[in-house]
Amino acid sequence: MDSPDSVRVKCESKGSCSPEEGLNNGLPEEHNQASGGRRRKRPVQRGKPPYSYIALIAMAIANSPERKLTLGGIYKFIMERFPFYRENSKKWQNSIRHNLTLNDCFVKIPREPGHPGKGNYWTLDPAAEDMFDNGSFLRRRKRFKRTDITTYPGYMQNSSAFTPTPTGRASYPNSIYSSVGSGYNPQIHQTHHPAVVHQYYQSPGEAGQGQHRMFSIDSLINQQSLMQPSPGAELTHHSLGLNGNLGNMTNSCSVGDLSCFQTQSISPTGVGSLLNRSSNAVSSNLTYSYSSSPPHLPVPPASYSPNNSQLYGSTSRLAMRSGPCVDHTDQLLSLPGTQINGVCQYNNSSYMRQTHFASGLERYM
């Protein structure tokens, strides 16, 4: 059996027998008793402010006159206000950068062309102004998540060219940042998005008239209709159905007379007069080839764009084809109206029946 002296030597070799030695190690006595030998992983450093990095960034932006700062300006404010961060700047500066990019409450604003310098500006999202309890930077209510990425006009990181120009939101009246958003110029920079080539602004009086959009469906259709060679209507096989004796006449011609295609219900005897009226109006030798359509199709009404009087068709079924269609049109126009028996009536509307084609005419497809 070991003597008491030998036990005391073993205990001293471990270095954790007396409370005095515990105090010499840097930990108080009550800490060792309360934790039961469990040490704190990251002890609190002396002199470190009790604010999180998000609170430090928000504090720096709030104390800025323009409510926006560059990354260097945020570093400067933190080091001037808290002497603790004047040492070991590399560690906490990395944490500041990570918090700026990973938290939705901070918004990046590109630098304006007339203000040379390095780095973009950072500001606080107006919807995140109340994320601290009672204006105190010590406690945050919850993690802020942005619902609208176009908070500021200059923030065009994920926006598209087809979206309307965003406008800045008003700041909250009862907030610690009462003037956030007042020092920003609502300007879209062309260098941030290649498709943004113009800037559209409107005054408060023009807000009720609707906002002009750079790219809209109407403007794209109008530009496409101007590229067409003729402003006339399209005479397609949807509106004229031919039987087997007439042959395969599926090519459509551009006809200058628009009045003869504005009716939706026609009679078999009126088809001949319609063809006679359009015999002198053939003004284009460009043909469009169409795929085979269903056997029963109603006569489509004429459709016009809102801002243009030209008649336009669907762009997905247009395909340029060489060769004039005057010969086929002359053969069609030379027939009387009684021989065209493909017109049928259904619910007071006319539709054309596409019959089988004669042999030997497949080369015109």
From Swiss-Prot:
Keywords: DNA-binding, Nucleus, Transcription, Transcription regulation. It comes from the Eukaryota. Pfam families: Forkhead. Induction: By pax6. The keyword Repeat does not apply. GO terms for cellular component: nucleus. First expressed at the end of gastrulation (stage 13) in the anterior ectodermal placode. During intermediate neural plate stages (stages 14-16), expression expands to the presumptive nasal ectoderm (PNE) and the presumptive lens ectoderm (PLE). By stages 18-21, expression begins to deplete in the PNE, while intensifying in the PLE so that by late neural stages (stages 22), expression is restricted to the PLE. Throughout tailbud stages (stage 23-31), expression is maintained in the lens placode and lens vesicle. Signal peptide: none annotated. This is Forkhead box protein E4. It comes from Xenopus laevis.
